[in-house]
UniProtKB/Swiss-Prot annotation:
Residues 24-106 form the Lipoyl-binding domain. The gene is gcvH. GO terms for biological process: glycine decarboxylation via glycine cleavage system. This is Glycine cleavage system H protein. Belongs to the GcvH family. Binds 1 lipoyl cofactor covalently. Gene3D superfamilies: 2.40.50.100. Keywords: Lipoyl. SUPFAM superfamilies: Single hybrid motif. The lineage of its organism: Bacteria, Pseudomonadati, Pseudomonadota, Gammaproteobacteria, Aeromonadales.
Amino acid sequence: MSHIPSELKYATSHEWIRVEANGEAVVGITEHAQELLGDMVFVDLPEVGKQVGAGDDCAVAESVKAASDIYSPVSGEILAVNEELEGSPELVNSDPYGAGWLFRIKLDDAGELANLLDAEGYQNVVDEE
């Protein structure tokens, strides 16, 4: 069974988001998602400064099995991307909730977080697959 940290929020499309005290947030894909995809070979990240809407596809994870779109769980401006993934995409596999983060985003509307799932809700989504 996949690890689902309780302090994060989740999208049904298997992204996680961690909101920080300064109103910025970090986004990545869940352990469950990386298990389904398999070994990462490349991650195409969004451009810094790009505006994205909640649910917009903004990145692509390419693994030995498939390429999968990654969606922004919230609306906002991309502030930074994890440049470590350029040379080490496998960090998404080995540490999906830590060193394998994908991008930082400045939230346009913190109210959108209410549309996301807590750990229990996300576990139910995983169980239904």
